[in-house]
Amino acid sequence: MGSFGMLSRRTLGTDMPVMAQIRSLMAELTNPMSLAQGVVHWQPPQKALEKVKELVWDPIISSYGPDEGLPELRQALLKKLREENKLTNSQVMVTAGANQAFVNLVITLCDAGDSVVMFEPYYFNSYMAFQMTGVTNIIVGPGQSDTLYPDADWLERTLSESKPTPKVVTVVNPGNPSGTYVPEPLLKRIAQICKDAGCWLIVDNTYEYFMYDGLKHCCVEGDHIVNVFSFSKTYGMMGWRLGYIAYSERLDGFATELVKIQDNIPICAAIISQRLAVYALEEGSGWITERVKSLVKNRDIVKEALEPLGKENVKGGEGAIYLWAKLPEGHRDDFKVVRWLAHRHGVVVIPGCASGSPGYLRVSFGGLQEVEMRAAAARLRKGIEELLHHGMVE
């Protein structure tokens, strides 16, 4: 005992969560300002919180619920999926966040040794979900250099040439960490490529409402497609841990397999969180879009802070809550830059190496209100200018 040789090779081979490393870094600092974690600055709707407050003493809140989720929440989600996402043939399972939804799907769809496809820069938690479940052949495809959109031509070649065919392709739309989005024609083409190849497509729609400058989010539906959604960012419910899976109602046995996984991880999402979600949905998507509008100013503030890197080196800001910035040549060790920015300038961001892209930074503009965002951006700009002109001065 006490030897690493006694621990699971799967977990030993899984990346350390970057946010756990960032939290440790922040604990070393005095008054750091975080542009790191993907959070929003608002809380759930006040009316919804007031209703939940009245339920705290109800014994049902402390009980287990159906594995798939409360019936009233699932019905509300089906209505939302039909009306807003145009998903008319889907069923849903409620999960303890979108990350847990993704893990459920990986365990349901993949066997150890299967190959899967992601696109660079990828969402680090999804990559880790594959690692920890024994999916060791993770094929990482390129994003287009000018847009970071998934390269569909590369995907078509890869799926046709790989033997056996990869089991799953996954995309995040809009992108985390890229802050870009997948236009509808491209998303439909990716879906068709996956269908023709006989592989699953998982689309993470966590940031579905976070679209800017008139751009529109869209979903695709099919028997080979599974969509993942989240309440965390939309309704400011990060700590309430609630997400859901939308899958084709025509898939025989799929729900049964999901229940097996669900019953052995959370059993069910927290009942009080599900009740809050029911009440939050009553506020409608307009409640979300009003708050997302406030992020446009934040995005522009952070973009301005990143200008010294050159506009061609800053991508994203089309959707989600992220900008994706390329560091100057000679600074490929992005985690070293992150630590330096934190200790020298008191601002914290995420290294691109966590998403398979050394030499980049992910900068979140969702977690602070405008006044604080300006202060954090000022620290970031000062740090970047010093990095460019003098290097990492101690």
Swiss-Prot record:
Swiss-Prot/TrEMBL cofactor(s): pyridoxal 5'-phosphate
Residue list for modification N-acetylglycine: 2
Residues engaged in binding pyridoxal 5'-phosphate: 64, 98-99, 123, 176, 207, 230-232, 241
Pfam families per UniProt: Aminotran_1_2
Primary subcellular site in the record, as a coarse category: cytoplasm
Quaternary organization: Homodimer.
Protein name per the record: Aromatic aminotransferase ISS1
Organism: Arabidopsis thaliana
Classification of source organism: Eukaryota, Viridiplantae, Streptophyta, Embryophyta, Tracheophyta
Gene transcribed to yield this protein: ISS1
